[in-house]
């Protein structure tokens, strides 16, 4: 949704990127060079990464050694860093736990040399996912205990993303206190946060329609014109059951013992994947074909992970302005599907 960047520019000046395309989008459309991190850079992508980045974090010293000479020779003003792994995270879902045992992310303290290589100016870590300031407090304790002896050698500390500071119960005053305390202890360090999904938390529903209702062994499924597999993959991967406007989310297995008069439905996607369905929801009326189903909070970690499996039609992307007008950003067409696999005519 790069067309919404003017809104973001009212609040922030910088962006982050994890790939060459994200870095280009940040540079060309947002208008700032990105703080870029990737698990691995390639010879093909790295020249463009340098053009579009103010900071580049390397996942390993082997990657740093491979590409740092290119940074020096480029003439670009780029600050390089290394991703550290404090081996501590309170993220419970392993899919999103960057510090899980055996993770491919970052360098542990036992592998850091006492004297950092020339050119390493910062540390980057990412240990959170929709986390509170209190989880950050615990993480900082581990980082300082483990890595503080290297702090005199660096200029910046990037605490990554996953800070859900726009959630209603997030303690922003506690966050401010933590950051001020950290800065007081290490006044030479620039402290960086990448709040990520906090910018779009609870800002974007996915509006679907019921296209059929089927019943098998007492389980009623409302088949929608969208797909969990294609349009909401995070729901299946986590997994988590999204909020549906006007419906009560029930335990997943509740539908297996539901009575007909209870209006309890499973929601099914319109792909051919057997597992393209989710949960149990109780509605206050029997669902009808053509009825709208609004799935809440479907922007972050959902819209960006969509795919075109089965050639399923993608939902359009639009913004609802404060003057009550709707602006369509992207209306997906057959050509978008066709041209992903071969160049169009």
Give, region by region, the residue ranges found by the protein language model.
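Feature marks short, surface-exposed loop/turn motifs that line or immediately flank catalytic pockets
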Residues: 88-90, 129, 165, 199, ...
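Active-site-proximal beta-alpha core segment in soluble small-molecule metabolic enzymes
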Residues: 1-156, 170, 178-181, 185
């Amino acid at each position: 949704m790069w067309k919404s960047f003017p809104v973001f520019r009212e609040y922030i000046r910088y962006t982050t990127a994890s790939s060459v395309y994200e870095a280009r989008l940040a540079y060309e459309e947002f208008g700032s060079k990105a703080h870029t991190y990737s698990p691995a850079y390639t010879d093909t992508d790295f020249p463009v990464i340098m053009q579009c980045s103010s900071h580049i974090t390397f996942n390993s010293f082997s990657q740093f050694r491979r590409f740092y000479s290119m940074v020096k020779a480029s003439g670009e003003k780029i600050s390089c860093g290394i991703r550290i792994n404090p081996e501590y995270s309170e993220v419970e879902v392993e899919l999103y736990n960057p510090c899980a045992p055996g993770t491919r992310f970052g360098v542990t303290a036992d592998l850091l040399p006492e004297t950092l290589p020339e050119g390493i100016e910062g540390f980057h870590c990412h240990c959170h996912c929709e986390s509170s300031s209190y989880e950050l407090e615990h993480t900082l304790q581990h980082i300082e205990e483990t890595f503080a002896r290297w702090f005199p050698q660096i200029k910046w500390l990037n605490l990554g993303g996953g800070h859900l500071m726009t959630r209603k119960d997030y303690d922003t005053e506690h966050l401010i206190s933590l950051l001020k305390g950290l800065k007081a202890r290490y006044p030479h360090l620039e402290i960086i946060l990448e709040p990520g999904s906090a910018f779009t938390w609870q800002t974007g529903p996915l509006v679907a329609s019921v296209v059929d209702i089927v019943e098998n062994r007492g389980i009623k499924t409302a088949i929608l014109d969208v797909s969990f597999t294609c349009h909401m993959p995070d729901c299946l991967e986590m997994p988590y059951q999204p909020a549906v406007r006007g419906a009560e989310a029930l335990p997943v297995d509740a539908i297996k013992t539901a009575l007909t008069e209870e209006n309890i439905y499973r929601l099914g996607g319109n792909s051919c994947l057997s597992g393209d369905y989710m949960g149990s929801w109780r509605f206050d009326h029997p669902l009808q074909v053509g009825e709208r189903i609004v799935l809440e909070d479907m922007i972050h970690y959902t819209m960006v992970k969509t795919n075109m499996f089965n050639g399923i039609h993608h939902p359009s992307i639009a913004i609802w302005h404060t003057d009550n007008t709707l602006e369509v950003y992207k209306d997906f067409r057959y050509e978008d599907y066709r041209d992903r696999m071969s160049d169009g005519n």
